[in-house]
Every structure is written in structure tokens, then in C-alpha cells.
Curated annotation (Swiss-Prot):
It comes from Homo sapiens (Human). Belongs to the urea transporter family. Inhibited by phloretin and para-chloromercuribenzene sulfonate. This is Urea transporter 1. The record marks 339 as: Important for channel permeability. InterPro entries: Ammonium/urea_transptr, Urea_transporter. One of its GO terms (biological process) is urea transport. Glycans are attached at residue 211. One of its GO terms (molecular function) is water transmembrane transporter activity. Keywords: Blood group antigen, Cell membrane, Glycoprotein, Membrane, Transmembrane, Transmembrane helix, Transport. Homotrimer; each subunit contains a pore through which urea permeates. Identified in a complex with STOM. The lineage of its organism: Eukaryota, Metazoa, Chordata, Craniata, Vertebrata.
Amino acid sequence: MEDSPTMVRVDSPTMVRGENQVSPCQGRRCFPKALGYVTGDMKELANQLKDKPVVLQFIDWILRGISQVVFVNNPVSGILILVGLLVQNPWWALTGWLGTVVSTLMALLLSQDRSLIASGLYGYNATLVGVLMAVFSDKGDYFWWLLLPVCAMSMTCPIFSSALNSMLSKWDLPVFTLPFNMALSMYLSATGHYNPFFPAKLVIPITTAPNISWSDLSALELLKSIPVGVGQIYGCDNPWTGGIFLGAILLSSPLMCLHAAIGSLLGIAAGLSLSAPFEDIYFGLWGFNSSLACIAMGGMFMALTWQTHLLALGCALFTAYLGVGMANFMAEVGLPACTWPFCLATLLFLIMTTKNSNIYKMPLSKVTYPEENRIFYLQAKKRMVESPL
């Protein structure tokens, strides 16, 4: 990502009284400073690493790539997300990490924009590819031969990303997780459930009406499905993992964390409104696409105002309903819906035009995180008022 707020360092002189010295950074004053260093997009760390060994820079790129799945450009958040994946399943964490590494190396070999690589934008799609290939593998955990197709499909992600960016940049639109959707759909279509080497889990369409009893609805399970919905962005159904992911998002941006939770909640509401099987709702299948959509529209690619906040809620609901339609459609050919609903719905909302000045689409080159995006929007609005011509 691009700009971030400038951190101002204030050093107080050391006070010497006899033999006692008072540190310039003590207790409560030091903590906010340290916290400010690890929040947002940690641009200061990226700048400090520019003259450091390339191995340290590469680790930073990988961690940012892991966190960019949820639009977070923060290596500490990447560490937390990796911890969450380890809590869910160490094998999934390994395949996701491997996919990110291979994709980032491939982007370097293809001489892609170094600033985009450093922000993790050539790694996050392969993170999902690696994790979801393990999730959908019918061979179970630690099927080591799976690492070969994980590497192969991860290498396609920078190609998809670069090609899609060439097209979508004409409208100043992001590629989102379209490369992941393309790569995973291609892999699952080529292998399928009956492949002797790399069989995938069987995806079948619904052929009978679900037996819904509203008296069986559990408020506790619905509450747990909020973090589970966020966790399902990475294919995880553990509520503790989802909670760790929310914490990782919170570290970078409280506004993003809020919209992630709201989006998951709206997905649950959409599922209940269509009498979806409770197991699907508890499993987070109704929450992850709407959570991504709510984050994207709620301050990330649209400057946050009350108007865009309401637009984000509408986009989240629209995404949830589109998701069940696409899931039913794609199940006919044995494929999961992945994050196709999020990509298509959110791109549709971003393309939308309006004369309302409070609905402001962020220039893609200026997108950082919601709090900083809003500062940019207010400054741009002030400049327009001061010099309308």
C-alpha cells in the first residue's frame, strides 16, 4: 500500500539528579508509542528494512502477504494469522506459507512491481491457494505430494494478478482474490473427487429440502459463528482461530475489525432469512464472503462516511445472497463457490457511479487502511472546498 501517517518521535532530555536518571520513555508514555509502531501498515518498519539483508525484507513481504488476504498490510498481523492457522491445523499453515513464498518468488522472477511485492500483494492469493488446496484434499493431512501442485498453482497467481491488474487498472479497481478463485477452480476442475493422485473432497448439489426446526436454533452457536465466519476467509472453522484473526485485523485497524464482525453477522442474518441449514451457518459458510465485502466497502476502498458505511452493509447482504446462489450453481459442476461472490459483488458496488460527494471511492494508489483513508478523503474534500475550480 502507499501512504501512511508520519510518526513523530519526541525525545525528552534525560534528567539527572545526583546519581538517579529518569528514562525518557517510561511506563504509560512508552506503551502508546510502541503500540503506534505496530498498528496500521507499519510503514516505518518497511522503510527501515530497505537497507537490511534481503532475507529480512523477504520475511516481511511473506508476513504482509499472509495478512493481505483480509486487506491488512502488517507483518505482526501476519504473524498472528499464521498462529491462528497453526491453532486450526499446522498442515494448512504449512501449505499456506509455502504458497505465499513460491508466489512471491515467482513475482520477483517475473520482475513485477517491487513496491507491490513488498506490500504482500503478490503473495496473498497464493496463501489462500495453499490453504484451500489442503482443505479440499481428500487425502487428509500431511499428504506431502500435495506440496507439488501447491507450488505449481501458487506460481500461476502472479500471472493471474498481473494480467487482471492490467485490465482492472483501467477502471482503478483492485484484483481482490480473483487470482485465487481462478487458480483453485482450475485445480479442482482438473482433478476432482476421483483423481487417483490428488483427489478432492466431493462437492454435490442439494437435492432434498433441509429439515429445519427453529426450536433447535442455538444463540451460543450463532454467537460463535461470528468469529467462525471470519475464520472461514482462510477456510478455518475454529472459533478461537477466527478470534485470533479478528485480533490481527484489530491490531492494524479497529474500523476494519468492526466491519469484519458486522459483515459476518449480516451473513448469518441472510442465512436465517432463507432458512439455511443451521450447520452451514454455524460452520461460517454464510459469513466469510460478506465479511470480506463489508471490510472492502467499509473504509478500505471507499472512504468511510455514514453513507459508505450503509453501503457496506448493503454490499455484505448482497454478497451473502449472491453467495448461496453461486454455491448452488457451482455445486452442479462439483466446485465450491470460494470467494467468487465477494469479488463479483464488491467490484459491482465499486463500479457504481453516484453524484453524492459523501460516497468517495479511494484512488487505488492511495489506499492504505480505513483510518488513514478517511484522513486522505477529508483533506481532499477540504482542498476542493478551498479551490473549487
